Regions:
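Active-site nucleotide-sugar/metal-binding loop of Leloir-type enzymes
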Residues: 28-30, 78-82
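PLP-dependent aminotransferase-like
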Residues: 1-66, 73
Length: 134
């Protein structure tokens, strides 16, 4: 986050769940806020409905850290369907691991296209540059 010139603002947790406390999110939002980045801690899903309501109210993206939430569902749906994106880690300390690595689950084609370019050093194919000076 810092590397990209952004400044994280931390929001306290709900002591009962260990997850971000939705009641405290709005107080942390400023005109510079662009996203809410909650973590599903130890397989306990965040209150995705309330977080999305807050994000919609302020026009913010929601990017979940779902590294602990493989297979976790809320109302019969995977937590990976919540928000604009979910991130997964395959580090050795996670439930499913490859020693290192991860995955992104996105819900819109434009974001996926941009991420695909970034992961391939800005190339769309063998010769087409899409992001100059990456």
């Amino acid at each position: 986050i810092w590397w990209n010139g952004c400044k994280p603002v931390f929001v306290d947790i709900d002591p009962a769940t260990g997850n971000i406390d939705p009641d405290k999110i709005e107080a942390a939002i400023t005109p510079r806020t662009t996203a809410i980045m909650p973590v599903h801690v130890y397989g306990k899903p965040c209150d995705t409905k309330r977080i999305q309501e807050i994000a919609d109210k302020y026009g913010l993206k929601v990017i979940y850290d779902a590294a602990h939430a493989f297979g976790v569902e809320v109302n019969g749906e995977s937590v990976l369907t919540a928000g604009d994106m979910s991130t997964l880690s395959f580090h050795a300390t996670k439930v499913y691991n490859t020693l290192e690595g991860g995955a992104l689950v996105m819900h819109d084609a434009e974001t996926k296209k941009r991420v695909d370019y970034l992961k391939n050093f800005g190339f769309a194919g063998e010769t087409e540059d899409t992001i100059i000076f990456l």
